[in-house]
């Protein structure tokens, strides 16, 4: 019996691992070694097979997402993406809606690119790690030179042409202690309304991670720092992927949002420029090669293969006993298997490197998540969380400890912006009516 058409996500890499930058923490640059002499450009037959098989497999979906990542996909040139639109027009079923997405470092984006992306309604993800000093710490070009100015120039072009975009920000050793500053920069300086905050975890050996990696506690505190700012001022206006996913889990949806925190995984695969399909973007390795979409089995058949189903189910089945009895398991689900290289207090292998941070964050947001959940269940807007925070803040003295548990005083931490707004209101009273 053929597999039933259904929704899954394909991260396609038309240039493979090839990129014009040399970001120090990038795990994918080394994958170039898997395909020596391949040319690192997706050929026409793979391009057409990918789009045709994806559209056919997701015939019942409200919208089909066609995702291009890298490496750096803009190295393919605009004509590749023009060809993408031509193929989609020919291969799509009547009425089938398609959303094209592009994840880019933005350094090659100019007005021609931006006009094309705007005209064809691409959703663009821009990789940026915060203000200049934080961004340039690891995100450098092949010559080791900083990239911040080039990223901002590309982003400015996207904004001039009205391209819908979101920010993908890694949380690493250089910015991990500055959550609110990073968030405020993305929100206020760049105008980002959609954000992904991705932790950098580079496993070295044993239970060690690289010096560039964020620690578990750092990541948890980073998320809390951002959440406390977001919850007071931006619910409903700014969307942070981790917070949306968390709320979905508090609503009882254990497969919603990020695959990292879903109960099982396996529905997000990686397609190389050659047509090789891998179990996951983080498992582009010969041991996890499912097959090639131009050599017999289709994309859907490979995604639905027993091997891939077992890969996804293992996320739940390999959870240590420590995780199974954890009070925040419903929201965490053990994190991504790639980072489960610690040993539990019981001596069992398979604890996630960021476990301490996940517990910090999920326990901290339990009450506000319940508030939003209850608001939504009563048919109200989650923005009511702002009022809940405001009521609590009104009872807080300026010298009280901040609610983010940073150890700083309220007036010097998340209360600083509120105090500033209050001072402006006093200095500028409303006119007489």
What is each stretch, according to the model?
Residues 5-45, 415-419:
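Canonical Radical SAM [4Fe-4S] cluster-binding loop centered on the CxxxCxxC motif
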Residues 244-360:
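Accessory C-terminal segments flanking Radical SAM cores
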């Amino acid at each position: 019996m053929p597999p039933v058409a259904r929704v899954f996500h394909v991260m396609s890499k038309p240039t493979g691992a090839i990129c014009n930058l040399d970001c120090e923490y990038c795990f994918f640059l080394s994958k170039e070694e898997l395909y020596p002499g391949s040319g690192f450009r997706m050929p026409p037959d793979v391009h057409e097979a990918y789009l045709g098989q994806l559209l056919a497999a997701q015939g019942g979906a409200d919208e089909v997402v066609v995702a291009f990542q890298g490496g750096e996909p803009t190295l393919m040139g605009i004509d590749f993406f023009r060809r993408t639109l031509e193929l989609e027009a020919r291969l799509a079923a009547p009425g089938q809606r398609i959303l094209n997405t592009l994840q880019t470092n933005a350094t090659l984006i100019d007005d021609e690119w931006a006009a094309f992306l705007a005209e064809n309604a691409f959703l663009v993800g821009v990789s940026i790690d915060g203000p200049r000093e934080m961004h340039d710490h690891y995100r450098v070009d092949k010559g080791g030179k900083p990239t911040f100015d080039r990223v901002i120039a590309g982003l400015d072009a996207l904004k001039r042409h009205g391209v819908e975009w979101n920010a993908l920000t890694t949380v690493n050793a250089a910015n991990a202690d500055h959550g609110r500053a990073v968030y405020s920069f993305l929100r206020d300086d760049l105008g980002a309304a959609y954000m992904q905050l991705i932790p950098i975890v580079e496993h070295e050996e044993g239970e060690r991670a690289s010096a560039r990696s964020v620690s578990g506690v750092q990541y948890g505190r980073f998320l809390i720092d951002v959440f406390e700012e977001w919850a007071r001022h931006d619910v409903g206006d700014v969307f942070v992927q981790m917070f949306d996913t968390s709320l979905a889990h508090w609503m009882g949806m254990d497969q919603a949002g990020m695959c990292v925190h879903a109960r099982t995984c396996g529905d997000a695969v990686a397609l190389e420029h050659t047509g090789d399909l891998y179990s996951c973007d983080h498992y582009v390795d010969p041991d996890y090669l499912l097959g090639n979409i131009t050599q017999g089995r289709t994309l859907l058949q490979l995604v639905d293969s027993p091997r891939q189903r077992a890969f996804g189910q293992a996320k739940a089945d390999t959870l240590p006993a420590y995780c199974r009895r954890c009070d925040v398991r419903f929201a965490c689900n053990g994190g991504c298997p790639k980072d489960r290289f610690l040993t539990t207090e019981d001596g069992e292998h398979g604890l996630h490197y960021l476990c301490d941070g996940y517990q910090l964050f999920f326990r901290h947001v339990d009450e506000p998540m319940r508030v939003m959940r209850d608001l939504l269940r009563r048919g109200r807007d989650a923005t009511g969380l702002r009022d809940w925070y405001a009521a609590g803040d009104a009872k807080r003295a300026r010298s009280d400890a901040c609610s983010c548990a940073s150890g700083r005083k309220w007036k010097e931490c998340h209360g600083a912006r509120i105090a500033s707004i209050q001072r402006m209101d006093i200095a500028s009273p409303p006119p007489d009516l």
